[in-house]
């Protein structure tokens, strides 16, 4: 195994305290959304701070056009795979559409994420309108974050994927949502598709750390989907996504080479086949011949 692929020998899972304290220390926390065992393993090897089991997996892993079809059963199954792939990485489970629309439902599903999925914390979406849900989760002892700005669960109300907070009034609503999340006891919040200056100013008003996706460099940390930044998911690329690799191109080239070698008889060769002792093979041929004449 190369040095680049070797697991960090002394890596310890991040704690809630460390994540909260990153606000004061100035350490930029790195989050990435990982839908499966392999991408989670890559994230841990790379030193990512938080592996996010995002309901975006409904799109990048299941081919849906939005996150709405994600179910708790689906999310728990993927969370289990992520935990196996990244056992030493703090894991945050994103609660899917309508899985937290009542306090009882939120507590039940958040508990599933923690007990069955192996997550270290959960993240619903929403601010003031969900503050009672967030507080109930926190009060029950479940580490909880939230997500504001562009919230995929309410995308239809926004008229599609549109930047949020571009007017002073809209920006104030995001600020009030942020304070509601903090007051509910959440340890972190995520901004999505918010103008950089707005997200930066709001972040400075808060005591809890913020992470951004399409919210500029002024947030306390950043999150991108691993399938986006690695070029695995290529159906579309949001403006805020930077491609650090193009694994789809590499994968297609590899598969084309495989197809070509099988079609032309070059694969498998002796190096990729199992041998047999000559005497055993000769005996086998004799047995086959005898069977033909029975």
From Swiss-Prot:
Origin superkingdom: Bacteria
GO cellular component: cytoplasm
EC number(s) given by UniProt: 2.1.2.11
Binding-site residues for Mg(2+), renumbered to this chain: 55
Compartments it resides in: Cytoplasm
Binding site for 3-methyl-2-oxobutanoate: 55-56, 123
Swiss-Prot/TrEMBL GO biological process terms: pantothenate biosynthetic process
Required cofactor(s): Mg(2+)
Top class in the EC scheme: transferase
Subunit structure of this chain's protein: Homodecamer; pentamer of dimers.
Its job: Catalyzes the reversible reaction in which hydroxymethyl group from 5,10-methylenetetrahydrofolate is transferred onto alpha-ketoisovalerate to form ketopantoate.
Protein name, UniProt field: 3-methyl-2-oxobutanoate hydroxymethyltransferase 1
């Amino acid at each position: 195994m190369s040095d680049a692929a070797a697991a960090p020998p002394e890596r310890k899972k991040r704690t809630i305290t460390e994540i909260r304290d990153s606000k004061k220390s100035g350490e930029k926390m790195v989050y990435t959304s990982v839908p499966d065992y392999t991408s989670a393993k890559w994230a841990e090897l790379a030193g990512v701070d938080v592996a996010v089991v995002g309901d975006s997996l409904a799109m990048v892993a299941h081919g849906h056009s939005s996150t709405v079809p994600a179910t708790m059963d689906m999310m728990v199954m993927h969370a289990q795979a992520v935990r196996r792939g990244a056992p030493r990485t703090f894991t945050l489970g994103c609660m899917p559409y309508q899985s937290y629309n009542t306090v009882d439902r939120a507590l039940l599903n958040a508990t599933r994420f923690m007990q069955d999925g192996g997550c270290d914390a959960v993240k619903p979406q929403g601010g003031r309108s969900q503050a009672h849900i967030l507080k109930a989760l926190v009060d029950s002892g479940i580490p909880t974050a939230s997500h504001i700005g562009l919230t995929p669960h309410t995308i239809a109300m926004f008229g599609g994927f549109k930047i949020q907070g571009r007017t002073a009034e809209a920006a104030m609503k995001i600020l009030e949502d942020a304070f509601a999340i903090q007051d509910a006891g959440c340890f972190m919040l995520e901004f999505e598709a918010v103008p950089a200056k707005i997200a930066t100013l709001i972040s400075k008003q808060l005591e809890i750390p913020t992470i951004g996706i399409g919210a500029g460099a002024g947030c306390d940390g950043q999150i991108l989907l691993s399938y986006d930044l690695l070029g695995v998911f290529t159906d579309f690329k949001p403006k805020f996504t930077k491609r650090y690799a193009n694994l789809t191109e590499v994968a297609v080239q590899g598969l084309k080479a495989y197809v070509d070698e099988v079609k032309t008889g070059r694969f498998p060769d002796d190096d990729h086949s199992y041998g047999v002792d000559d005497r055993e093979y000769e005996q086998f041929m004799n047995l086959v011949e005898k069977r033909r004449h029975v």
